[in-house]
Amino acid sequence: MKGLVIKNTGSWYQLKTDRGELIKAKLKGNFRLKGIQSTNPISIGDYVLIEKDLYGTAFISTIEDRKNYIIRRASNLSKQSHIIATNLDQAFLIVTVNYPITTTIFIDRFLVTTEAYRIPTLLFFNKTDLYNNHDMNYADILIHLYKSIGYSCYKIAATKDEDLLFMEKLLRGKITLFYGHSGVGKSTIVNRLIPNAKQKVQSISKHHNKGMHTTTFSKMLELPSSSGYIIDTPGIKGFGIFDIEKEEISHYFPDIFRFSPYCKFYNCTHQKEPACAVREAIKNHYISKSRYISYINILEDVDMNKYREAF
């Protein structure tokens, strides 16, 4: 029997079978013996084969080949990876410039990973109904920046019906990952798109202007009329890059990669090398300084954590 993994609550996985049934299954113990370094060898979005024992307990015996996946480091000091989701058609990064603040470093870390794994990513600047003039101007600056690089960006408010209808059109017929900090409004959007989802919603901390975790486990939710799936994920503070070599990082900054062939040295890291076309482009405002700061931030992070074997 074949199944699609739609939820993971620790040792149990909830699956939707090819017969349309919802069942719970465990992972067979021998998966732990295959040298897998990921904290979760089975992920939301995986297609798996299921076996049942004499007592009727379902076990996942095989993972089918993945079309793609998105991965992050499990924690700041970890040698392990955490697979966020697999077999995606696209990712929606939910961003807020206030209530709470999403940094450009967080945005760029996520975009580098989706570039590396060839997952089309759209940016949604949420809570625009709460923005003052300063917030709106800053959102417009970021939208101009990321649109110039090639990313689709949209200003939305989860309270507005027309914005939700627009998002719903983009979701049709696709498996979409929702990602972002706690408190940016992912669960509110999901609840409005899928009224029976009942994802928990909690206000942000007034003291720290940061979101508090409401979604505990990642979960795949079906849109009405079977028009697609959303994978809602727990909000996180940071995003650790995993499985990308130092020399590859600039490849996943399209704006930096555009100029790197013109550097004097083929292996230029765009830091202190002479005749660096990238640093010259920054001086001439062809590359945003915030993007370069993110690039250096990731470069230093990867330098300290040379862990590549994710599986």
Swiss-Prot record:
GO terms for molecular function: GTP binding; GTPase activity; metal ion binding; rRNA binding. The keyword tRNA-binding does not apply. It is found in: Cytoplasm. GO terms for biological process: ribosomal small subunit biogenesis. Its cofactor is Zn(2+). It is an enzyme of class 3 (hydrolase). Keywords: Cytoplasm, GTP-binding, Hydrolase, Metal-binding, Nucleotide-binding, Ribosome biogenesis, RNA-binding, rRNA-binding, Zinc. GTP binds at N126, K127, T128, D129, G180, H181, S182, G183, V184, G185, K186, S187, T188. Its EC number is 3.6.1.-. PROSITE patterns: ENGC_GTPASE, G_CP. Binds 1 zinc ion per subunit. GO terms for cellular component: cytoplasm. Zn(2+) binds at C263, C268, H270, C276. Belongs to the TRAFAC class YlqF/YawG GTPase family. RsgA subfamily. HAMAP family: GTPase_RsgA. Monomer. Associates with 30S ribosomal subunit, binds 16S rRNA. PANTHER family: SMALL RIBOSOMAL SUBUNIT BIOGENESIS GTPASE RSGA, SMALL RIBOSOMAL SUBUNIT BIOGENESIS GTPASE RSGA 1, MITOCHONDRIAL-RELATED. This is Small ribosomal subunit biogenesis GTPase RsgA.
